[in-house]
Amino acid sequence: MNARTEPEVFDTLAALIAVRAAQWPDKPYLLSPDSGHALTFGALATDAGTLGRSYAAAGLGSGQTVSVYLPNGEQTARLLLGTMACGLVVNPINLLCQPAQLRYILAHSDTRLVFTWPDGEAAIREALREAGLDVPVLVTAPDANSLPALPATHDAASPLPPPQPDAPALLMYTSGTTGTPKGVLLTQRNLVANGTNVSREHCLGPADRVLATLPLYHINGLVVTAIAPLVHGGSVVMPMRFSASAFWQDSARHGCTWLNVVPTIIAYLLNDPHGQAPAGVRFCRSASAALPPEHHRAFEARFGIGVIETMGMTETAAPAFSNPLDPGQRRIGSIGRPSGTRARVLGRDGKPAPDGQVGEIVLQGESVMAGYYKAPDITREAFTHDGWLRTGDLGYRDADGYFYISGRAKELIIKGGENIAPREIDEALLRHPGVLEAAAVGVPDPAYGQEIVAYVVMREAARCDDAALRAHCLRELGRYKTPKEFRFIAELPRGPSGKVQRLKLLNHA
């Protein structure tokens, strides 16, 4: 294991960026493979200062919200980080939002200004018009290397005060697949604390460089690949979007030492027959959804890169659990041990469950959200009476302190009174050589209450039918857990984090 210096402790993004700029003004912080341009630590600090003065001149002040509707790129990172460093609240909007969600988020967030790019301008203007909002829209390119000009309405604007650690910094809306999106409000301290946790957990230092292919409008992409490198003084290689054919080329050309992916990316990389991993990549971290053990083992065997499985959520500013960096201590199938958080499992009686017993995982820690924006009732429901965040994940802890996820409480299949974790069925199907992806759901059944339907994405050129999959599941799962029906689809619906949206599948069940 490579030794690294313990990361310094900061409590605001403004302080963090200022220190790195003074320390390494000319060192590249972010490299853009699409444009070939590099953003240095010094330029990031300068741009943050310029942005703060521009916001003040435009009549915007600390704590007010600015929305960013852009794909990944240098400009996107500059606007997100610079806005938070100025003391304003940034609202990165998911590009997968449907028109009704976009309308809701722009109105609910109390946004005062929107940054977008040419391809997104029409959607933003239409959403603002339908919401009855008169908000300035600034159009820029995701990979632009200079700030867009803001409208100046105040001649003698005072400089914005530096943000305090507990000041709100990020307003990020959940995907809202089961109802109205919820705005997760995270503070300066929340974000920097978890950037520090990531750096410490993976022993990262100034020589490390991450390939960042996850969207910055998702908490994983923002905290793990944009904020953590600020903490440890490393750098980021940020293509505009993920491409299986370019993934390893970008890693090799820019000397990446670690990777940050979701299970979907691992599946695509395994399905690409031409991919070859370069030397120099120390590890790959996988997060945001459970990594099937078969894919975990296959990735390590083929590419020779160890996978660190982690787990987090928007409400915890990304990771809350991580497997150790030391390969000998990692456990395939486990989300690891608490990382920067305290965790326990609660039984049905609301009391801590013994090791090995499944219950709801709850969390406390410095990275846990301040609450949901303008939703005090929902915020109260999200916490236990003594202040533990309810994750909604079912799981258990083993005797060595490692945690395992069984599924989501809302996604649990209850067949004839028997609780069945969908993930168990998914993993059995993934052990079939022709299956690329799978997701099981429970559907209403007059006899059992619920029956099991499995949605399956087959590998290219694979030949398989219902009978073959049923025979496979009978061997792997037994008759009771074998799906009643198999439905073949081109792709599974996923949120920006890569999680399968099972409840969307239910709409088609």
Curated annotation (Swiss-Prot):
It is an enzyme of class 6 (ligase). Induction: Induced by sulfoacetate. The gene is sauT. InterPro entries: AMP-bd_C (IPR025110), AMP-bd_C_sf (IPR045851), AMP-binding_CS (IPR020845), AMP-dep_synth/lig_dom (IPR000873), ANL_N_sf (IPR042099), Pcs60-like (IPR045310). Belongs to the ATP-dependent AMP-binding enzyme family. SUPFAM superfamilies: Acetyl-CoA synthetase-like. Disruption phenotype: Mutants do not grow with sulfoacetate, but can use acetate, taurine, isethionate and sulfoacetaldehyde. This is Sulfoacetate--CoA ligase. It catalyses: sulfoacetate + ATP + CoA = sulfoacetyl-CoA + AMP + diphosphate.
